[in-house]
Amino acid sequence: AAPKVREMASFIKAKTAVLMPIYNEEPAQVMARLLAIGEDLQQAGAGGRFDIFVLSDTTNPKIWVKEEKIWLEAKRILESGSFGAESGELRESVAGAVEHGVRASGAESRSDTEAAGRSGGTAGGAGLHIYYRRRAQNTARKSGNIEDFCNRWGAEYDFMLVLDADSLMTAETIVKMARLMEANPHAGIIQASPQMINSTSMFARMQQFAGKVAGPVVGAGLAYWQAGNSNYWGHNAVIRVKAFMECCKLPVLKGRAP
């Protein structure tokens, strides 16, 4: 990690939970991205201020079993700091995530592509922990998944970084967002503009190119016109947990769902 990232990380006092909500995703790819993020945070000296949560809403039993198996391997790797010792499918996925994401891009990116409590324990290494939780009933889908985390463990964290299953972010971006949130006590949400990576089809590569060219302009325009306000995009955002829990619970609307 660059010296400036380590310096920023050294000033962070708040505790942040990195949340990865998943639903019948490919476990190796999901865990590979989290390993890449975890390794980058540890190298930045920020491991002690972050925990990772895999929040599973998976309904397919085969995928569920695979999730727990690969999570245990990720736990072992983070616990021992033995990055590069991944096996089989996870090794290939980690190589792709590291090559095309954290180390190569230097920017937040997205690919185009109930175990009780914090089941199974923790993974440490420079203070970074990874937890896995699967809900027996995926009530309210992703929003319900995040709500369940807040109800169980939200009081233990100042901020939460909400990812999508295909999100990949650098320690530099994550540390900077947490530092900005800590320095601005009236900020409720700070979010990063995503970029596509690893696109393969012609259409997806066109989208990736357009996003690379126009994304910074659109982001700057939104920041200018919305000033200190914004809508929540749903991912790649650091959120102040206490404010979120107090203000963002919405009632269930009456009538038939659309």
Give the label of every model feature segment:
Residues 2-101, 106-110, 117-258:
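Internal catalytic domains of large membrane-associated glycosyltransferases
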